[in-house]
Amino acid sequence: MKVLLLLGFIFCSMAAHGKRMERCEFARRIKQLHLDGYHQISLANWVCLAQWESGFDTKATNYNPGDQSTDYGILQINSHYWCDDGKTPHAANECKVRCSELQEDDLVKAVNCAKKIVDQQGIRAWVAWRNKCEGKDLSKYLEGCHL
């Protein structure tokens, strides 16, 4: 009985966290989705951004009490501007997606929304990129990936 309870707890925890991608797996996937070089932003920049925004967790969420918004998914896309979570006041939903769709493991909607963000604001829209990636040697983020 205890084993069944423990297994249930483990599976519930896994479902809540979603898929934590490996660094190179993430790099390969977003390259397939043509994010590498988009607006001259290198693949290493995107990998660095995802590392510091979500730790490569597709289901990551972070609540921002100031504007009552939430950041969603592996790229931590914000509900105040970019998606609809049904609870953020005055949400713009510029990407025309439900925020939960930005947490899908295939990354298609997250990447499409990221392209829209870059079209409008550039990669500087992400605070973690400005703080952890901008102006740094990012070669380590693609090391060993054989892309």
Swiss-Prot record:
Record flagged with keyword Magnesium: no
S-S pairs: 24-145, 48-133, 83-99, 95-113
Signal sequence annotation: 1-18
GO-annotated biological processes: defense response to Gram-negative bacterium; defense response to Gram-positive bacterium; killing of cells of another organism
Entry's Gene Ontology molecular function annotations: lysozyme activity
Localisation per UniProt entry: Secreted
GO CC terms: extracellular region
Leading EC class: hydrolase
EC number from the UniProt entry: 3.2.1.17
Domain of life: Eukaryota
Domain C-type lysozyme: 19-147
Catalytic activity: Hydrolysis of (1->4)-beta-linkages between N-acetylmuramic acid and N-acetyl-D-glucosamine residues in a peptidoglycan and between N-acetyl-D-glucosamine residues in chitodextrins
Primary role: Lysozymes have primarily a bacteriolytic function; those in tissues and body fluids are associated with the monocyte-macrophage system and enhance the activity of immunoagents.
Assembly mode: Monomer.
Stated family: Belongs to the glycosyl hydrolase 22 family.
Additional free-text comment from the UniProt record: Lysozyme C is capable of both hydrolysis and transglycosylation; it also shows a slight esterase activity. It acts rapidly on both peptide-substituted and unsubstituted peptidoglycan, and slowly on chitin oligosaccharides.
Protein name in UniProt: Lysozyme C
Organism whose genome encodes this protein: Trichosurus vulpecula
Lineage: Eukaryota, Metazoa, Chordata, Craniata, Vertebrata
